[in-house]
Amino acid sequence: LKIRLDDAQQANRKYRWLSSRNLPSGTRSYSWVHVTGNTQSKRAFLTEGPLKGDVASFLAQDALFICIGGVNALNGLNDTIRGLGVREVVEGMDMDQMTNPNVRKAVLAMRREVQKIPGIRYSKYTWNPAYKGVDDYLLSRAATM
């Protein structure tokens, strides 16, 4: 279970995964891959966070978005890409990769994993870093139309 925290004191910890891992017969929480938009598309944008992907897909006229739970949450990503039959993956990860070395390292590892998939063309979508996420950037474009 993933819960959004609205704690101004910990702005860097927006979401928490809940589990019963420490309880008798408990289980850990598992990250999952969220897919939104036109699943017939041969191009998929890859980003972090299901809500961000839903918003970005809507703002990009139903573009296909594959959304991981976090930059280190890669379980199931390659299988999802293969299962959708996409030919192109466009990285749309948050711009904090430019300033946070830990995020950058995780994004590079993710990129290497996706690039191992045969037949996939991989590119990176870039925008003005004043907009942290692809959803923020697309919303700014929609607001000026």
Positions of the model-derived regions?
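Short, aromatic/basic amphipathic alpha-helical patches
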Residues: P101-I117
